[in-house]
Amino acid sequence: MTFFVLIILVVGLTMTTASDVLILGSTSMGYANQQESKVHCRYSKAYSMLQVKCSDPKLEEIPRDLNSNIQVLDASFSRIRDLRNDSFSSYTKLLYIYLGDNFIQNIEESAFAQQYYLEVLDLTKNGCDNLPKNLFQLPYLRRVYLAVNKFGDSVFQTEVTSPLNFLQLHRNKLTKLPEMGYLPTLQNLNVSENMISRITTKELARFCYLEVLDASKNPLNLEEDNCECVIMRRWLKLRKIIFKPEYNCTPAAFERCGNVTFSNETLTIYDECTNILRIQMQTKKARNIWIIVVCCVACFIVIVFLVLLCFHRRNKRKKQKLKKEQQRIAANNANTQLLNSNLK
């Protein structure tokens, strides 16, 4: 009877320990002994990246005792209210941060300053009305989800150097498209359910490689009297931009504005935007060429070193062999002399 009780206790203890840390795949990943924060955070592997999920209604701040090597942090559906300058200071390898559906209302200026490798940030459905100005200077940031917040136009009056290709601003407090300078890498922009009443080709020219613009459920009013509607339709068609909602002009407007062209200012802005991307691509190409050249030179040096090392070792072996041969000959001569002396 005692034996069966011991078995039940061991099995129960094992199940309790296993439930604390969720590990996907092989049990040899080595995270089972990871110290857990007060809120149960689950570790797993996602496409070879170390991921931690801390979604919990009791979580009110970013945990401080997580594995410092995490690359994916998911604290969605929690109760986080502030992101301080040191909230992520222990986790400098993050690529993905998911903080959707929290109560975040304040983000300090340096909250993301150390996230050099950050690629994706999700702040959907919070109470945010401010963003750090340096967020859009992160060198690898490409996708940002900011839907269902309180962001106004002033938040996005900042220059962008990040390679941003996706920006989600659904249901905020925008009255116009974001004024973020030139965004040559942006492909998808969602500003639906805001308070935008007007979109011009001059604004769109700053997004010179835009593919999708969702402006649905905005009080848009493209005036037909001054040919705004026709000019917009032509720009969207020329640049192959998918525009939501589909906006049609009247036949009378097309007839009246048949000879209207884009303004010189719009075309200049578009050319400057494409030039920026061209320079970026050329810089990247030149950098890659230099990397290849440096790698080739390094490989050549290594090969020369290995060849010289082989010659050195071969010469060393020859010298050792010659020395042994000389020692053998000397020993034979000594033995011969000794034998001759004994015969005399």
Q: Residue locations for each model-derived region?
A:
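Cleavable N-terminal signal peptides of Sec/SRP-targeted secreted and luminal proteins
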Residues: M1-D20
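Membrane-proximal C-terminal cap and juxtamembrane stalk of leucine-rich repeat ectodomains
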Residues: A18-Q34, K217-K344
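LRR N-terminal entry segment and analogous cap-like coil->beta motifs
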Residues: A46-F103
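Conserved LRR concave beta-strand detector
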Residues: Q51, V72-D74, D82, Y96-Y98, ...
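Canonical position 11/12 of the leucine-rich repeat
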Residues: P57-E60, R79-R81, F103-Q105, G127-D129, ...
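Canonical leucine-rich repeat
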Residues: I62, L83-D86, Y91, I107-S110, ...
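C-terminal capping segment of individual leucine-rich repeats
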Residues: L66-S68, S89-S90, A113-Q114, F136-L138, ...
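Leucine-rich repeat domain C-terminal region
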Residues: Y140-R143, A147-K284
